[in-house]
Amino acid sequence: MTTNKPSFSYFKVLVLGQLPRFTLNYFGTDFTDNYVESIDDEFRKTLKFGQLPLFVDSDGFRLTQTDAICKYIAAKHDFLGKSIKERAIVDETIAAVHDDVIIPGYKVGKGVEDKKVIDTIISRHFTTFENVLAENKFIAGGDNYTLADLYVFVAYHYYKHLGHSEKFQNKFPHLEALQAHFESNKGIAEYIKNRPDSGRGI
């Protein structure tokens, strides 16, 4: 049976596309990364819910929804935690990062959300992540990194990209160490270096 390289499709903006792209690149996946300008009617008909992102595996398996894609990729690499409790915390972290950090940050960057939201998120979510790392070393506990750590890193990286670096200054040493760990990964370093600029800052 002929197989093709996996492919991932999303726009140039980071937002929800960055999480699967970071995950794929972290594991050194050889995949075709499609930066989509717009979704025409024909393309939309091929999408399960009429929207991106879209991941197509080498065997033709198609998957949409950011978190489902990331968990599918992570599962292939035993990156979802070893115990039921770790996996539950991974799910908890994924939901918090996606719904309470990435989306509001994007909305502020787009100008449709009050900037005061950023201070609340930093004091509530990033402080919580910092405290967890100070106590446990890894977000989900356990003895190794999981998708929860990668999600927290992406959120931290994204907020710096959005221009909030000075709000983090000297406050989150464990998050800084987490960022250094993931950005030392060859695949992630190459992705950050070579990804196109959306021109929109988000």
Swiss-Prot record:
It comes from the Eukaryota. Residues 83-200 form the GST C-terminal domain. InterPro entries: Glutathione-S-Trfase_C-like (IPR010987), Glutathione-S-Trfase_C_sf (IPR036282), Glutathione_S-Trfase (IPR040079), Glutathione_S-Trfase_N (IPR004045), GST_C (IPR004046), GST_superfamily (IPR050213), Thioredoxin-like_sf (IPR036249). GO terms for biological process: glutathione metabolic process. It holds the Pfam family GST_C_3. Its EC number is 2.5.1.18. One of its GO terms (molecular function) is glutathione transferase activity. Disulfide bonds: none annotated. It catalyses: RX + glutathione = an S-substituted glutathione + a halide anion + H(+). The modification N-acetylthreonine is found at residue 2. Gene3D superfamilies: 1.20.1050.130. The keyword Acetylation applies. Keywords: Acetylation, Transferase. Residues 4-81 form the GST N-terminal domain. SUPFAM superfamilies: GST C-terminal domain-like, Thioredoxin-like. Glutathione binds at residues 10, 44, 51-52, 65-66. It is an enzyme of class 2 (transferase). PANTHER family: GLUTATHIONE S-TRANSFERASE (PTHR11571), GLUTATHIONE S-TRANSFERASE ALPHA-1-RELATED (PTHR11571:SF164). Conjugation of reduced glutathione to a wide number of exogenous and endogenous hydrophobic electrophiles. Belongs to the GST superfamily. Alpha family. This is Putative glutathione S-transferase alpha-1. It comes from Dictyostelium discoideum.
